A protein has these predicted regions:
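C-terminal motif of bacterial Sec signal peptides marking the signal peptidase cleavage site
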Residues: 2-5
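Active-site-proximal, well-structured secondary-structure segments within enzyme catalytic domains
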Residues: 136-145, 149, 157, 175-218
Length: 218
């Protein structure tokens, strides 16, 4: 009888490993091609700066986020995780990473979409911003070159002040995005988005704060 029970438990564990492997395989079939398209769309948007390219990039990111926002899939992952029966070390690690990825997206899909759209709008503004110094319109690379090589104090000041003007263009959008992200994080049981980001990337907020305090005291 005891042997039968042990054998049954072993089969149950093996089944849970199998269930998770199948979950990962199904997820990869959806995510891998979409991730490739998303990365290419983002690259094209960053290069062209065009409205339509940023819109396409946002759409792919929304599609990707909705995969990880799927409530049924998250319930399956949660069941697998809480079973404690994924015994393979690599699978267990994959389970932790995927669980955190899904958890961070378990919010209202409409709000998720709004955040992605706003984030994309901010990125577009940053991407297309040009600092005007005199009659010159400078790209980020040109600004970086001046700031890292020039010894002309006046020129350095003019370039730096011109570059800072991007702040006023994105300030309101950033404040709005911060508020939306914090509300989303609170709805998932976190204090704010900062805490959620750290914990879901497996970092301890207290330890991070302690580290920065130590750096400040150096």
């Amino acid at each position: 009888f005891l042997f039968t029970m042990c054998k049954g438990d072993k089969n149950k564990k093996e089944d849970m490993n199998k269930v998770f492997k199948e979950f990962v395989a199904n997820l990869e079939a959806k995510v891998i091609p979409l991730h490739k398209e998303s990365a290419l769309a983002y690259f094209n948007a960053a290069i062209s700066g065009k409205e339509e390219d940023f819109a396409k990039s946002a759409e792919f990111e929304i599609q990707m986020s909705k995969i990880f926002a799927n409530k049924e899939d998250f319930a399956t992952l949660k069941k697998i995780k809480e079973s404690g029966q994924v015994t393979d070390e690599l699978l267990a690690r994959q389970l932790d990473v995927l669980y955190n990825a899904y958890l961070g997206n378990q919010i209202d899909e409409k709000k998720l979409e709004e955040m992605i759209q706003l984030q994309t709008e901010i990125e577009k503004k940053y991407n297309n911003f040009r600092a005007i110094v005199g009659k010159d319109s400078l790209t980020d690379n040109q600004i970086e070159e001046v700031l890292s090589t020039s010894t002309d104090t006046r020129k350095l000041k003019d370039v730096w002040m011109a570059h800072k003007k991007i702040g006023s263009l994105v300030a309101d959008d950033i404040k709005k995005l911060v508020k939306m992200r914090n509300e989303a994080a609170v709805s998932l049981g976190f204090k704010n988005y900062h805490e959620m980001s750290l914990k879901l990337s497996e970092q301890d907020p207290t330890e991070i704060e302690k580290l920065f305090d130590e750096l400040d005291n150096l």
